[in-house]
């Protein structure tokens, strides 16, 4: 089955100016999504859709990435990703339709290619129409109706560990059968979720999110080597373990 990835990357961002091209731990944020798409074992085509000349110029530096200029009507704040993804994919199907379309957000730099490939492998072996990246985040939550009345979004008050699974979309990726991708949506009748590791789930929306992601990407590994024997004892080994896990 042929798989195409669409990376939607607007030039404007109210929360973080030039977010997609701002350096995240030494390289533009969008580079992480492009890198994952190119490294995937299942992806055949990588498309970057943007209204920004800067983003398009950067994406064009990659040999196997097609940079597509986005019309201004598709770059407005109120426009959802559905028509954007449809526009990008439909412009690249002169030689035939793709079987699967993956929307890969540039705002999830912690996502690993191993997780992406695991999700694609799961989807391709299933009968699902759509697969959405999620994290399990059970909490006692409340909702509000149109009249302003609040009501619980749970049936029974329980400890967090006893609550039913509650999936929250991470925004990292959304995988769809090609026939489900239209200007009005990307969800089919059969929708599944793929739980990503908590450490890969951050979606950059605020400056705080940015700082968190950058600090995690900038972490350095420290190797502890501890030698011990019967005469020397192993007390120092336990102290080293305390340091390693502190």
Give each language-model segment a name.
Residues 33, 238-246:
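Short amphipathic alpha-helix
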Residues 4-10, 220-230:
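Nucleotide-activated donor-dependent transferases that construct or modify glycoconjugates
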Residues 182-195, 199-202, 207-221:
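Catalytic donor-sugar/metal-binding loop of nucleotide-sugar-dependent glycosyltransferases
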Residues 15-19, 25, 228-239:
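A short, glycine/small-residue-rich beta-strand->loop->alpha-helix junction that serves as a flexible
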